[in-house]
């Protein structure tokens, strides 16, 4: 069976995870060793052991940081997977589905080699390339930097992403603190601070601060967009994969012996009967007007029987598909929860990114978005949209349509949503951007 073959493939992939992770960490360590032997006479990749310039050293240091980060991730994966899957045998190679796994001796040799490489690079190595760069290089204008320096900075940032994330979160907290109400308007305080920074006599530090702020903003945008795409793609992919390869085969196998199961609810049954009646009436009509040969009662009965068999299989599959949707959506929610639970740092960055987009919009743009949102979800025509959404959800989960529940939901939920929106406008937006609230009221009138 295809399902058994798929499960065997997944099992084999899981059994090979420790070996695969260790090999990738080992190859990354070999890359670092290659850079050391080729460019640094076999010594540590650092400025004091190099005959190159600052730009070239920054490139090599960024490369090593990337490999060190990869080693760290793969060793973590190796330890976690090895504690779950017992892959290694006692000093002898084992064969698993034709794949020879690594022995304990080979594993220890690779780990010793990795330790000998990463032992040279301590925690302070992450800041070493910045400390040793001359002041003339640090104070160079951003427009005069070459493409190679930009590439090395990008790789250096990706390798030390946690450090940058901490700085972004700290800057976010300081920005949120400025949003608290004070004696003077926030815009006036921000303008005064900007003028003060521009006339600061210590120009070098100001330029470095502006450049650092630009880098943080750029990577904050990249991280936010990637995380938003991850929140969308991971649940959808989980829903489709679990439904196609796991849940649907199990549901079909469970209901295969239950031939009496055809309709999951009364609405589908009425829809099938209505379609069968239309088919019978169409046969009589086409025979009467000469579009088809006139059939006898026995022939009409035979055609109706064939159509009934087709409809029974069609509506049976629709019911099974609805049951599979329930479990697949549960798996999708679990995947979404895992992504959110293990991405607290990314969530902080995304919140700051969205706050920056919202508060940097013009007053008319803010008012336009508020009116658009309210008209779609709580406006005069919104009940029709909510009704379509509820009917679609009922079909998706195979639930019978309940008009009373739909009317009750439409009568209460948009009202609650409208109340929350008005409270947000009164409590927060009125304090942060009073002119946007005034523009919203004028546009609404």
Curated annotation (Swiss-Prot):
The keyword Nucleotide-binding does not apply. Its main location: membrane. The chain crosses the membrane at residues 227-247, 322-342, 369-389, 405-425. PANTHER family: CHLOROPLAST ENVELOPE MEMBRANE PROTEIN (PTHR33650:SF2), CHLOROPLAST ENVELOPE MEMBRANE PROTEIN-RELATED (PTHR33650). Signal peptide: none annotated. The gene is pxcA. The keyword Metal-binding does not apply. This is Proton extrusion protein PxcA. Coiled coil: none annotated. It is a multi-pass membrane protein. GO terms for cellular component: plasma membrane. One of its GO terms (molecular function) is proton transmembrane transporter activity. Required for H(+) efflux immediately after light irradiation to form a rapid H(+) concentration gradient across the thylakoid membranes. Together with PxcL, contributes to transient H(+) uptake following dark to light transition. Keywords: Cell inner membrane, Cell membrane, Hydrogen ion transport, Ion transport, Membrane, Transmembrane, Transmembrane helix, Transport.
């Amino acid at each position: 069976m295809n399902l058994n073959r798929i499960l065997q493939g997944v099992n084999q992939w899981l059994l090979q995870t420790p070996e695969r992770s260790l090999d990738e960490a080992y190859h990354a360590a070999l890359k670092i060793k290659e850079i050391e032997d080729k460019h640094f006479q076999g010594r540590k990749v650092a400025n004091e052991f190099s005959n190159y310039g600052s730009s070239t050293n920054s490139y090599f240091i960024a490369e090593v940081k990337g490999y060190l980060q990869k080693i760290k991730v793969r060793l973590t994966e190796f330890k976690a997977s090895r504690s779950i899957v017992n892959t290694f045998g006692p000093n002898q190679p084992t064969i698993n589905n034709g794949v020879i796994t690594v022995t304990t001796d080979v594993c220890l040799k690779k780990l010793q080699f990795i330790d000998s490489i990463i032992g040279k690079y301590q925690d302070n190595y992450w800041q070493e390339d910045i400390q040793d760069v001359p002041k003339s290089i640090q104070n160079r204008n951003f427009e005069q930097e070459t493409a190679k320096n930009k590439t090395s900075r990008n790789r250096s940032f990706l390798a030390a992403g946690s450090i940058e994330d901490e700085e972004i979160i700290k800057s976010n907290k300081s920005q949120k603190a400025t949003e608290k109400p004070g004696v003077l308007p926030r815009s006036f305080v921000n303008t005064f601070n900007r003028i003060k920074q521009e006339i600061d006599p210590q120009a070098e530090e100001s330029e470095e601060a502006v450049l650092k702020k630009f880098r943080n903003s750029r990577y904050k945008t990249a991280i936010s967009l990637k995380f938003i795409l991850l929140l969308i793609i991971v649940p959808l992919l989980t829903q489709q994969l679990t439904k196609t390869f796991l849940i649907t085969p199990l549901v079909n196998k469970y209901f295969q012996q239950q031939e009496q199961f055809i309709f999951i609810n009364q609405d589908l049954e009425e829809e099938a009967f209505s379609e069968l009646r239309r088919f019978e009436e169409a046969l009589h009509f086409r025979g009467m007007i000469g579009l088809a040969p006139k059939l006898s009662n026995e022939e009409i009965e035979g055609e109706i029987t064939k159509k009934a068999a087709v409809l029974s299989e069609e509506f049976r599959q629709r019911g099974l598909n609805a049951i599979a949707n329930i479990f697949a959506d549960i798996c999708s929610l679990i995947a979404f929860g895992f992504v959110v639970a293990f991405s607290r740092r990314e969530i902080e960055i995304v919140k700051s990114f969205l706050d920056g987009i919202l508060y940097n919009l013009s007053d008319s743009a803010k008012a336009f978005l508020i009116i658009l949102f309210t008209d779609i979800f709580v406006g005069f025509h919104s009940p029709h949209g909510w009704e379509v959404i509820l009917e679609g959800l009922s079909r998706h989960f195979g639930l019978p349509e309940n008009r009373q529940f739909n009317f009750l939901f439409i009568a209460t939920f948009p009202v609650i949503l409208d109340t929350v929106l008005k409270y947000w406008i009164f409590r927060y937006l009125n304090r942060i951007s009073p002119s946007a609230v005034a523009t919203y009221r004028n546009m609404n009138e």
